[in-house]
């Protein structure tokens, strides 16, 4: 198992944790001095009270929690949000309220999930053209919505 260094920046911060034995993502909780209201169609930057030291070659991805999206229309506008291996500041979550009512975030609310993923830096090779494929340039719904039999 990969060990990642974490610093609790606030004494009441809840550190990320897996909710089930085989969960891919860890729940990330808000660390607030006072509740934050996220107005409809607005965003709020929510602190978590912790910072990470990720190994080179890894990133942390912040993703929405499905229950918040389903019940309250709360998501992350930049999903997945990337935390780079060389970032040492507090992890913060941008929440967006797609709902019609204000959404209150309380201290300790689980507001996102975090997945640790391997990443690789690449080098581009500029060429005059790309190799041909059956798909070609088809994209953005080119296969339709009906099930494929």
Curated annotation (Swiss-Prot):
Q: Which keywords annotate this record?
A: Hydrolase, Magnesium, Metal-binding, Nucleotide metabolism
Which pathway does the database say it acts in? Pyrimidine metabolism; dUMP biosynthesis; dUMP from dCTP (dUTP route): step 2/2
Does the keyword field hold Glycoprotein?
no
Q: Family assignment? A: Belongs to the dUTPase family.
Gene Ontology MF: a single term: dUTP diphosphatase activity
User: Binding of substrate: at which residues?
Assistant: 65-67, 78, 82-84, 92
Protein's name in the database: Deoxyuridine 5'-triphosphate nucleotidohydrolase
Q: What is the lineage of its organism?
A: Bacteria, Pseudomonadati, Chlorobiota, Chlorobiia, Chlorobiales
Organism expressing this protein natively: Chlorobium chlorochromatii (strain CaD3)
What reactions does this protein catalyze? dUTP + H2O = dUMP + diphosphate + H(+)
The record ties this protein, via CDD domains, to: trimeric_dUTPase
What NCBIfam families does this protein map onto? dut, PRK00601.1
GO:BP terms for this protein? dUMP biosynthetic process; dUTP catabolic process
Purpose of the protein: This enzyme is involved in nucleotide metabolism: it produces dUMP, the immediate precursor of thymidine nucleotides and it decreases the intracellular concentration of dUTP so that uracil cannot be incorporated into DNA.
Q: Does the keyword Metal-binding apply?
A: yes
Q: What is its EC number?
A: 3.6.1.23
Q: Which cofactor does it need?
A: Mg(2+)
One Pfam match, by short name? dUTPase
């Amino acid at each position: 198992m990969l060990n990642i260094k974490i610093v609790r920046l606030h004494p009441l911060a809840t550190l990320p944790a897996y909710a089930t034995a085989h969960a891919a993502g860890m729940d990330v909780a808000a660390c607030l001095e006072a509740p934050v209201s996220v107005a409809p169609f607005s965003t709020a930057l929510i602190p978590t009270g912790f910072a990470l030291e990720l190994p080179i070659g890894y990133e942390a991805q912040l993703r929405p929690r499905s229950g918040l999206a389903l019940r309250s229309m709360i998501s992350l506008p930049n999903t997945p949000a990337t935390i780079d291996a060389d970032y040492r500041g507090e992890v913060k979550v941008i929440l967006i309220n797609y709902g019609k009512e204000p959404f209150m975030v309380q201290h300790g609310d689980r507001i996102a999930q975090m997945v640790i993923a391997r990443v690789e830096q690449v080098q581009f090779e500029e060429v005059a053209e790309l190799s041909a494929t059956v798909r070609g340039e088809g994209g953005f719904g080119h296969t339709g919505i009906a099930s494929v039999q």
